[in-house]
């Protein structure tokens, strides 16, 4: 399954700079596709990214920048078929909302790891009453406060309060159930146009998850930084509702869950993708390894142990796994 991130935010907040810095810093060893969904006929940001990624192309053996104004899904399909990227970043127009892009990516079977809204800490006051800006924040589950070096601590705290207030009021909801699409959200800060690494930790491809499932007798590993990744194996005699109940009780310290599980009431194994409260499922053919769930977060040992105590079909081996 291809992973993706959607980058949204109002006009001039620094999306392109952040995206450029992010890919160069964290994904130079990956095959990355950049999709710029521009507003209007001329895409200046697309030209900037094309120049940057012509250099990354030589390093990572394949980074594609494609500017799409129309026929978004067909354009993304063309990228997938032609280049087979590992990760896709979509930068939306500053004048558009992110959720239609989110739905399109899911329709294409692409795992959306996060919808990131870049907020201009210095200039939020000047655009926070704009309805598009409000729905950009409401339709995201990761808010990144940019240009924090240009404001005081008091001003930054005021920005955080504004963002939280907008998020709570405009948090996008399921029209049928009235429940929020994103149960949880996080607020991060960018320094010098670079977002923190934790936003992107825990991005697993299916083959990596299968590799971990095969490796369940592996020796102890140490984890990087403060991000902990813990693996649980699931007993065979469970139903989909059991897995769903686990995901509904995930604490905020755990911001990603990946895995492949076999349940009695679904014919094929299910791929789980949980990211900051948002959950998606996809069936997977010909999976013969143990059912596995990978929990990723910050200082999560105690929370994962509590989950295993609450749900006796979760078994926690005594080792840690790092990417």
Task: Place the predicted regions along the sequence by residue.
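Nucleotide-state-sensitive switch-loop elements of NTP-binding domains
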Residues: 2-8, 13, 17-127
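Helical mechanochemical/support elements of P-loop NTPase systems and associated helical scaffolds
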Residues: 3, 68, 97, 136, ...
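A generic alpha-helix structural signal
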Residues: 23, 36, 76, 102, ...
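Short, aromatic/basic amphipathic alpha-helical patches
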Residues: 47-50, 160-163, 305-313
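Short, solvent-exposed amphipathic alpha-helical segments in soluble enzyme
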Residues: 49-51, 105-107, 134, 248-249, ...
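Phosphate/Mg2+-binding loops and adjacent switch elements
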Residues: 78, 82-191, 195
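C-terminal accessory "lid"/substrate-recognition subdomains
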Residues: 142, 151-289, 299-300, 313-323
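Flexible loop/N-cap segments at domain edges
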Residues: 295
């Amino acid at each position: 399954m291809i992973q993706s991130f959607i980058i949204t935010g109002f006009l001039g907040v620094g999306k392109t700079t952040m995206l450029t810095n992010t890919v160069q810093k964290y994904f130079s060893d990956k095959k990355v596709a950049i999709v710029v969904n521009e507003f209007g006929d001329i895409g200046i940001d697309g030209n900037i990214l094309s120049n940057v990624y012509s250099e990354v192309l030589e390093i990572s053996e394949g980074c594609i920048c494609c500017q799409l104004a129309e026929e978004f899904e067909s354009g993304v399909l063309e990228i997938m078929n032609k280049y087979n990227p590992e990760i896709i970043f979509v930068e939306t127009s500053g004048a558009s909302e992110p959720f239609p892009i989110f739905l399109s990516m899911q329709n294409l079977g692409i795992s959306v790891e996060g919808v990131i809204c870049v907020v201009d800490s210095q200039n939020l006051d000047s655009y926070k009453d704009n309805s598009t800006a409000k729905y950009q924040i409401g339709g995201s589950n990761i808010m990144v406060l940019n240009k924090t070096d240009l404001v005081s601590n008091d001003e930054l705290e005021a920005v955080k309060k504004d963002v939280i207030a907008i998020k709570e009021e405009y948090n996008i909801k399921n029209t049928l159930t009235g429940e929020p699409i994103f149960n949880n959200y996080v607020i991060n800060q960018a320094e010098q146009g670079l977002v923190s690494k934790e936003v992107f930790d825990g991005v697993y491809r299916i083959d990596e998850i299968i590799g971990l499932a095969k490796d369940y007798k592996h020796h102890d590993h140490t984890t990087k930084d403060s991000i902990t990744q813990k693996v649980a194996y699931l007993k065979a005699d469970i139903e989909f509702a059991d897995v769903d109940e686990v995901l509904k009780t995930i604490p905020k310290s755990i911001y990603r869950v990946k895995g492949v599980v076999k349940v009695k009431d679904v014919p094929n194994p299910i791929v789980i993708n949980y990211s900051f409260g948002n959950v998606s499922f996809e069936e997977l053919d010909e999976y013969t390894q143990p059912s596995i769930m990978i929990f990723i977060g910050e200082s999560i040992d105690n929370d994962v142990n509590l989950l295993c105590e609450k749900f006796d079909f979760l078994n926690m081996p005594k080792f840690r796994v790092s990417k």
